[in-house]
Amino acid sequence: ADAAPTVSIFPPSTEQLATGGASVVCLMNNFYPRDISVKWKIDGTERRDGVLDSVTDQDSKDSTYSMSSTLSLTKADYESHNLYTCEVVHKTSSSPVVKSFNRNEC
């Protein structure tokens, strides 16, 4: 049966920022079928560079998939923008599932 993804977005950790890097992570959990796409936007502009997607194998218990998408930035790049958004497109929804956060509210 088709299953819609549960989508979460996570800002970089303070520990990572202290080292000069910044990874924003979008998690999509327990979806089916496997075909899914993620689009990253920074302040409303699509960002393709530095994105790494990783799909986990089918879950033996409920036959769903999970995926993480990591947007890797420098700390300076991260701190020069405010709104971070991942948009997830899956057949279970006619419109994208959108998750975002404002950096200055973290």
Curated annotation (Swiss-Prot):
Keyword Disulfide bond assigned: yes
Paired cysteines (S-S): C26-C86
Keywords: Disulfide bond, Immunoglobulin domain
Tree of life domain: Eukaryota
Domain Ig-like: 5-102
A Pfam family per the record: C1-set
An annotated GO cellular component: alpha-beta T cell receptor complex
The keyword Disulfide bond is annotated on this UniProt entry: yes
Protein name in UniProt: Ig kappa chain C region, B allele
